[in-house]
């Protein structure tokens, strides 16, 4: 029993409020999901949210609205930590790219830089077969 109480105390102690004014929002927009992580300048995560974690399942996870809800959730937690200015780094071709940035902007967080960091191969590995829809 002492072990369970100890881990609960450790979890409660981790939720320390940090006063960080500037941060980086990493938006990973894939075709299936959108993941938003807000970090400080050193890369330590302050908050994160996913479309699937907001209650969207299946094909609804990949919608712009799901990305917007996830970005609002992560942004609110980051604002509680003191975030006022963000750099946004977008990775991936998914449909939630723009709506996540708009949602962060609508929260009142000042967006300083929007940067696309999508990895582009210089003719590396052979890609998977073409999709037929």
From Swiss-Prot:
Keywords: Ribonucleoprotein, Ribosomal protein, RNA-binding, rRNA-binding. Pfam families: Ribosomal_S11. GO terms for biological process: translation. GO terms for molecular function: rRNA binding; structural constituent of ribosome. Part of the 30S ribosomal subunit. Interacts with proteins S7 and S18. Binds to IF-3. Located on the platform of the 30S subunit, it bridges several disparate RNA helices of the 16S rRNA. Forms part of the Shine-Dalgarno cleft in the 70S ribosome. Belongs to the universal ribosomal protein uS11 family. This is Small ribosomal subunit protein uS11. It comes from Ralstonia nicotianae (strain ATCC BAA-1114 / GMI1000). The lineage of its organism: Bacteria, Pseudomonadati, Pseudomonadota, Betaproteobacteria, Burkholderiales.
């Amino acid at each position: 029993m002492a072990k369970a109480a100890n881990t609960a105390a450790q979890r409660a102690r981790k939720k320390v409020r940090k006063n960080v004014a500037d941060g980086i929002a990493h938006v990973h927009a894939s075709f299936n999901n959108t993941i938003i992580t807000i970090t400080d300048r050193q890369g330590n995560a302050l908050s994160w949210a996913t479309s699937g974690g907001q209650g969207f399942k299946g094909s609804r996870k990949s919608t712009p609205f799901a990305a917007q809800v996830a970005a609002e959730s992560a942004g609110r937690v980051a604002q509680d930590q003191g975030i006022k200015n963000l750099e946004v780094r977008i990775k991936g071709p998914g449909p939630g790219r723009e709506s996540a940035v708009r949602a962060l902007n609508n929260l009142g967080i000042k967006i300083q830089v929007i940067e696309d960091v999508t990895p582009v191969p210089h003719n590396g590995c052979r890609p998977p077969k073409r999709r037929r829809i």
